[in-house]
């Protein structure tokens, strides 16, 4: 899935909005949330004390994406993988992120509920993990958060799957998204 200027702007806008919404919440919850994190880190989602390799971080989000595509029988899927910094400096730790678009069939609200139901039947939990807030339909499972919304082209839905902040490799200068469409679509 090649990056276009519009895709980059959308991603940066979403990240900025998410950061603006999450930072005040994390600041207030950091002292009461018990979650292992790196010594000296003030980010409760940073579990880099138990790091994931690049391959593990990628598998953490690619495997669930494959399952979702199959379970919901998503059509015309396009998908890309990248590493996303878990802080606003672009420094480690990173999380694996899958962004996928899929063709909406019929009413988008009804179709999103179809996808949601398929995910719930495969063990996903409705809503975001405790302490996280998203717009759109959000589910989580095994450290992965999936958020669904309309894509810019309203004939498509978009799902973003984010893994845990446990990859400590420096991806600061990685600007590439790896096309993983063929890994998600069954021949």
From Swiss-Prot:
Provide the leader sequence positions. Answer: 1-28
Places the protein is found = Cell membrane
- Which keywords belong to this entry? Cell membrane, Lipoprotein, Membrane, Palmitate, Signal
Q: Which GO terms describe its cellular component?
A: extracellular region; plasma membrane
Lineage, top-rank taxon, reads Bacteria
Predominant location category: membrane
Q: Where is the lipid attached (N-palmitoyl cysteine)?
A: 29
Topology relative to the membrane, per the entry? Lipid-anchor
Q: Where is the lipid attached (S-diacylglycerol cysteine)?
A: 29
Q: Quote the protein name from its UniProt record.
A: Putative lipoprotein LppJ
Species assigned in the record: Mycobacterium tuberculosis (strain ATCC 25618 / H37Rv)
Q: Which gene encodes it?
A: lppJ
